[in-house]
């Protein structure tokens, strides 16, 4: 594949060029597990499925895949435990979500931009997120 930074790709091509093995769905699951862990001591498949509005069988498949990729530990009918890698990524996804929501709320003069954040959060790299955090802070200070 062409490694020229000025080369154009299809959307799928950019995804294939990504260094991370995480899909947007995997990111959503890790983010939700962190959110649930903030409220309760442990997470089970049914709670995860309910909060992501998916079937328990779909959640079970994704949790199994995340376990195989070493992001979490899970035994069938047991609790979900994040590995250190899973915890680091999950916490970053929470940060990314908050940065985007804060920026879009400031931009649109609103209190919540959940739908827009969910649609775009998977497509911005860490540098862009960090710069949006700085920009949002500066814009907030101007008010």
Briefly describe each language-model feature range.
Residues 35-40:
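Short helix-capping/hinge SLiMs at alpha-helix to coil transitions
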Residues 20-30, 83, 94:
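Short helix-coil-helix linker/hinge
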Residues 78-96:
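Basic, amphipathic "hinge/linker" alpha-helix immediately C-terminal to the N-terminal HTH DNA-binding motif
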Residues 6-21:
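Short, Lys/Arg-enriched N-terminal segment that forms or immediately precedes the first helix
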Residues 1-2, 115-143:
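C-terminal regulatory/oligomerization modules of transcriptional regulators
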Residues 27-34, 88, 99:
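Pre-recognition alpha-helix immediately N-terminal to the DNA-recognition helix
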Residues 45-80, 84:
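Canonical helix-turn-helix DNA-binding module
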Residues 96-107, 139:
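Alpha-helical linker/hinge and terminal dimerization helices associated
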């Amino acid at each position: 594949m062409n490694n020229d930074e000025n080369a154009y790709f299809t959307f799928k091509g950019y995804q294939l060029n990504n260094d991370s093995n995480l899909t947007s769905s995997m990111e959503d699951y890790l983010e939700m597990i962190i959110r649930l862990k903030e409220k309760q001591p442990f997470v089970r498949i049914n709670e995860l499925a309910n909060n992501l509005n998916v079937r328990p069988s779909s959640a079970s498949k994704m949790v199994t895949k995340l376990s195989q990729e070493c992001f979490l530990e899970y035994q069938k009918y047991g609790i979900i435990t994040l590995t250190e890698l899973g915890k680091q990524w999950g916490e970053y996804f929470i940060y990314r979500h908050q940065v985007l929501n804060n920026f879009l709320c400031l931009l649109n003069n609103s209190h919540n931009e959940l739908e827009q954040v969910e649609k775009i959060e998977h497509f911005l790299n860490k540098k862009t997120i960090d710069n949006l955090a700085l920009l949002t802070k500066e814009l907030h200070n101007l008010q």
